[in-house]
Amino acid sequence: MKKLITANDIREAHARGEQAMSVVLRASIITPEAREVADLLGFTITECDESIPVTASVPASVPADKTESQRIRETIIAQLPEGQFTESLVAQLMEKVMKEKQSLEQGAMQPSFKSVTGKGGIKVIDGSSVKFGRFDGAEPHCVGLTDLVTGDDGSSMAAGFMQWENAFFPWTLNYDEIDMVLEGELHVRHEGQTMIAKAGDVMFIPKGSSIEFGTTSSVKFLYVAWPANWQSL
């Protein structure tokens, strides 16, 4: 049976101080999540065995309308010896990959950041340290959100970062909000009109607005909301 190279294998190797791993494709299966984690950690996976054509280890492009499970299944089958695997083996490998992917996504979507709070409650957040959580109000889209200043800081306002790619979702604001776009474009649809703010622009959205937040490309912005408990209103 082929050895399955998982994201945990990459993490463990990286924790040992290793920067690269050589993998014999004829005897191994590298999960998509393992490759993703390797990219995030700057870890190099070297695929050995030049006797196997590149097309044997790199599956053909998959149409966008295929489900995620179909894409994972085809990736696994492409790395198994032709005619030498069973459906039960494929199902077993798919289950392991899906669990690994879910674990990776949950770990990757935990909000965090570094900050220093000085005398009198003055707080400085290290913007480069911010890791995004997932905004439940935008499901099923993957919208990142991290609160940086909240009522826990003794503030009557809240502030944080949001970011996502190529998605729109409806939202009703029961609070006032000001957004400053840091990257990309923020689109707000309201009463048949679309307002667009680009990097460096500031947008005000008054309380009571029923809108669609979105972007046709990508966006990252700083939001300031009043009152601080805007998510529970």
From Swiss-Prot:
Q: Which GO terms describe its biological process?
A: ethanolamine catabolic process; generation of precursor metabolites and energy
Query: What are the annotated GO cellular component locations?
Result: ethanolamine degradation polyhedral organelle
Q: Where in the cell is it found?
A: Bacterial microcompartment
Q: Does the keyword Nucleus apply?
A: no
This entry's Enzyme Commission designation comes to 2.7.2.1
Q: Which keywords belong to this entry?
A: Bacterial microcompartment, Kinase, Transferase
InterPro entries per UniProt:
EutQ, RmlC-like_jellyroll, RmlC_Cupin_sf
**Keyword presence, Kinase:** yes
Pathway field of the UniProt record reads: Amine and polyamine degradation; ethanolamine degradation
Give the catalytic activity: acetate + ATP = acetyl phosphate + ADP
Primary site of residence: other
Q: Which GO terms describe its molecular function?
A: acetate kinase activity
Q: CDD domains, alphabetically?
A: cupin_EutQ (cd02228)
Its biological purpose is as follows: A bidirectional acetate kinase that may drive flux through the ethanolamine degradation pathway under anoxic conditions. It may generate ATP that can be used by other enzymes (EutA and EutT) in the eut pathway. Might serve as an assembly hub for bacterial microcompartment (BMC) shell proteins.
**Subunit structure of this entry?**
Homodimer.
User: Family assignment?
Assistant: Belongs to the EutQ cupin-like family.
Q: What is this protein called?
A: Acetate kinase EutQ
